A protein has these predicted regions:
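Start-transfer (signal-anchor) and selected internal transmembrane alpha helices
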Residues: 1-40, 244, 452, 466-476, ...
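Active-site-proximal, structured, solvent-exposed surfaces of multi-pass membrane proteins
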Residues: 5, 10, 14-16, 665-795
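Soluble catalytic regions of membrane-associated enzymes that act on cell-envelope
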Residues: 113, 471-713, 717-725, 730-734
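Membrane-embedded helix bundles of polyisoprenyl
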Residues: 27, 131-144, 150-231, 244-264, ...
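Active-site lumenal/periplasmic loops and adjacent helix-entry segments of GT-C-fold
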Residues: 37-145, 150-182, 206-210, 293, ...
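Contiguous transmembrane helix-bundle modules in multi-pass membrane proteins
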Residues: 194-195, 214, 345-504, 752-795
């Protein structure tokens, strides 16, 4: 008799008993229902909190227009178009800046079918589509492991509405990964069990293009998955099968490398990698609460991404730490664990648990990124869903005792609510260490209620032929209720700051047409993130992790923090002149605060479209020359607080470049490195303005400038340095000099000069060749096996 949970030949799509489309429909309907209340409240412009509001809505709307050429004009100098985004921080290559977020996502490319103005209103329909696709993929994967296809439907719903997926609505593009991953695992199973060819290569390519960062973790997980299944002899491995699987892996990687090579070259310049001198940090987390949070995240529903119910220490917020299965928690998976010996699913989940608890192993899912994340949990969640439905389908499995055990573990967390605490300052005593008691009660209540309903259904209906369908209905109802509460906590928890988001975003579209003409940067004061993207202007305030890597060296050198956002303080006035900021935008409500905080260099310009606009009287047009230079060694010996002032006076060259280009400038005397006051800054701006380009035009592949010089000199542009840029002076290619620890300059002769900077992602030629070659090989490979299959059938 065949064991429950072992692999078998699945039903094929289109067969009478197949329920693929039913699963897709159920997942889509459930997602639509729990988004519906918020969709109505927001009038169709759904906004949530944090990253969703600041990044995802802005990115989707902006990139829809950018890809269609709705932003800056094409360059007249080159045939290269739509490669450089000025609205991304100080300017960034669009492919590298958005590959992590959406550039390779099939859902984003599908959204291009709709007008740019529709995108804020399509965020919910796109999320519903992602949930539907996730359900379909999970069903395809799970149907191999069940006897009754209804359990595959149930497992797909468990995966699709897991705590991980619902939590990551906050990040939006993470749901893309959740949606596409099951197809990758399904195609691997097809190759291992059925010797089915070409699908694995295809889904490797799709997942790699979709998100290169998450794909690293998928490679690690697939290795764990393959080794664990091989160790339990779930499939017969031959040299031929292994060779073809390796070939398809490489072929898929080649087809999906269109974004990979440029992204890798960009990441190598990004300082957010692991500290290889960590020592104990490799093996243990520094806070005990981190371990408790990890363990609890596998059994209890998740907190809101930016609110913790219990934890006061450790890295918890925004980490996507949840492996919770709706209604069931780990009850079914633990029941399966107890019932099976030497099972591959147990080994996969056990290995993943070890990886979760060891920092260096956890970071392996993210190429040894130094920041803690749990954004790979969706992969073991799919296996946990399989274990759960296998336990439910096997009538010999004890389901009740694991459910009781998980319930008691949940109840044990009440200790955090009643433990006595003495205030170190007053000496008074109180009860509980909860950070958000209300959210904790909601999470605990849903966790216990889910297990109570789970036990009731198992006891009453387990022997019924419709047990799987009843459990599916309960899971979907539970997922609906919890998702509404979870999203509501996150959404309305920031309502006091986000209630005017839609108004500010839509007003920014009006202001875009009312701002004075010209190519300049803007700044904002105490308004919502990424307004610059709605204005289609380079803005000093930008929230995004993957801007040009040189920005991550330029800002810290000035004492300006740059991790996932750029937000130089208003007090750093000299940055505004250096970076060619001409206008600052705030709201009428914040005008008084701004005027009290700002320096004398701002004058009121006008109020329109719900905004107040100020003009920078120390504005310097982009593209100007210097009289003085400073070596990087000398620059790093100065005080960070006044370095921006210093950069208005002198160009900073590396010691090597100073030996080559120093002859065109005068070495800044030591005495002039200290006179760094506002008055001297105004004079420096006046001098730089006198040498500025007469023409500066931004375009969607870089920029064009025209400048007249009295002598041969370096011309400075406050544009982030990137290996993808090629400079042309008077039509001739010229070397680009990295200056000021992250910006650019180019040497120009005396007289009139026409300068063009053209951007193409570094490595794009190689990645295109790999992708096109891979596609040709894949088509031939697929055609061969299709031909062989037809010939075999005829025989």
């Amino acid at each position: 008799m065949e064991r429950s949970g072992t692999a078998r030949q699945p039903q094929l799509l289109g067969q009478k008993k197949d329920k693929f489309w039913l699963t897709v429909g159920l997942c889509a309907l459930t997602a639509a229902l729990f988004f519906l209340p918020f969709y109505i409240i927001d009038g169709g412009f759904f906004h949530y909190a944090g990253d969703f509001n600041s990044q995802q809505i802005s990115f989707y709307r902006y990139m829809n227009g950018f890809i269609k050429g709705a932003g800056y004009p094409d360059s007249a100098f080159t045939s290269v178009h739509n490669t450089f985004s000025w609205a991304t921080d100080l300017g960034s290559g669009v492919m590298n800046a958005y590959s992590f977020y959406l550039y390779g996502s099939p859902f984003f490319w599908f959204s291009l079918l709709f007008p740019q103005g529709w995108l804020p209103y399509l965020m919910v329909p796109l999320l519903v589509l992602k949930f539907a696709v996730a359900g379909g993929g999970a069903y395809l994967y799970l149907r191999r492991y069940v006897k009754n296809i209804d359990y595959a439907v149930l497992g797909a719903c468990l995966y699709t509405f897991s705590g991980f997926t619902v939590y990551n609505v906050f990040f939006n593009h993470f749901v893309d990964v959740v949606a596409l991953f099951p197809y990758l695992l399904w195609s691997l199973d097809e190759a291992l069990y059925n010797d089915r060819r070409s699908w694995f290569a295809f889904w490797v390519a799709v997942n790699l293009v979709n998100n290169y960062f998450f794909f690293i973790g998928q490679v690690v997980f697939l290795a764990i998955y393959f080794i664990c299944k091989l160790s339990t002899r779930d499939f017969r491995l031959t040299a031929k099968k292994f060779g073809l699987l390796a070939f398809e892996s490489l072929l898929g990687a080649a087809m999906g490398s269109i974004l990979l090579v440029p992204a890798v070259l960009s990441i190598l310049q990004n300082p957010r990698t692991i500290d290889l001198s960590s020592g104990w940090g490799f093996l243990t987390y520094s806070k005990v609460q981190q371990y408790l949070a990890i363990l609890v995240s596998w059994i209890m529903p998740p907190d809101s991404p930016y609110l913790t119910s219990i934890w006061s220490e450790g890295v918890i917020k925004w980490t996507s730490m949840s492996a919770y299965l709706p209604l069931c928690s780990l009850a079914g998976a633990v029941a399966y664990w107890k019932a099976k010996c030497g099972d591959s699913k147990k080994r996969i989940v056990g290995t993943c648990a070890v990886f979760a608890l060891v920092p260096i192993l956890n970071s392996a899912f993210y190429a040894l990124n130094s920041s803690y994340y749990a954004r790979w949990y969706y992969m073991p969640v799919l296996v946990l869903a399989a274990m759960t439905v296998n336990a439910l389908e096997d009538h010999n499995t004890d389901l009740d005792s694991p459910a009781r055990g998980i319930s008691w573990l949940m109840i044990a967390t009440v200790a955090f609510a009643v433990v006595p605490v003495q205030d170190s300052d007053t000496g008074s005593w109180s009860f509980g260490v909860l950070k958000n008691p209300g959210q904790y009660c909601a999470v605990l209540g849903f966790g216990l209620l889910g297990l109570l309903l789970y036990r009731y259904l198992c006891q009453k209906w387990r022997g019924d032929s419709r047990f799987a369908q009843r459990m599916t209905a309960a899971v979907l109802a539970f997922a609906f209720l919890f998702s509404v509460v979870h999203i509501g906590i996150g959404k309305f928890g920031q309502w006091y700051t986000d209630s005017d988001l839609v108004k500010q975003d839509t007003n920014a579209l009006l202001l875009k047409n009312d701002l004075p003409e010209g190519d300049y940067r803007v700044d904002t004061y105490k308004i919502h993130d990424n307004i610059g993207m709605w204005l289609d202007k380079s803005c000093l305030q930008y929230f995004g992790s993957t801007a040009a890597p040189s920005i991550l060296s330029f800002y810290p050198a000035l004492g300006v923090k740059r991790d996932v956002r750029s937000e130089p303080e208003l007090s750093n006035y000299a940055l505004r002149g250096l970076l060619s900021v001409e206008y600052l935008i705030t709201t009428p409500e914040k005008q008084t605060d701004f005027e009290n905080e700002a320096d004398d260099g701002w004058e009121y310009a006008f109020a329109k479209d719900g905004y107040a606009v100020y003009r920078n009287t120390n504005y310097v047009p982009m593209g100007f020359a210097y009289d003085y230079y400073l070596t990087q060694t000398e620059y790093e010996e100065t005080a960070k607080a006044t370095r921006a002032n210093l950069l208005m006076r002198a160009l900073v060259l590396t010691d090597e470049d100073a030996a080559v280009y120093g002859k065109y400038l005068t070495h800044l005397p030591e005495g002039r490195r200290e006179e760094l006051y506002y008055e001297s800054y105004v004079q420096d701006c006046r001098e730089r303005r006198a040498t500025a380009a007469s023409v500066f035009q931004m375009n969607n592949s870089g920029f064009h400038a025209e400048i007249t010089l009295e002598k041969e000199n370096l011309v400075f542009f406050s544009v982030p340095y990137d290996d993808g840029f090629t400079a042309y002076v008077n039509g001739q290619e010229a070397d680009i000099v990295e200056v000021d620890e992250g910006l650019m300059a180019v040497l120009c002769p005396a007289g009139e000069n026409s300068i063009d900077f053209v951007y193409q992602p570094d490595g794009i030629r190689l990645s295109r060749a790999l992708t096109l070659g891979g596609i040709v090989v894949w088509l031939a490979y697929t055609a061969y096996f299709a031909w062989r299959k037809r010939r075999t059938k005829r025989a």
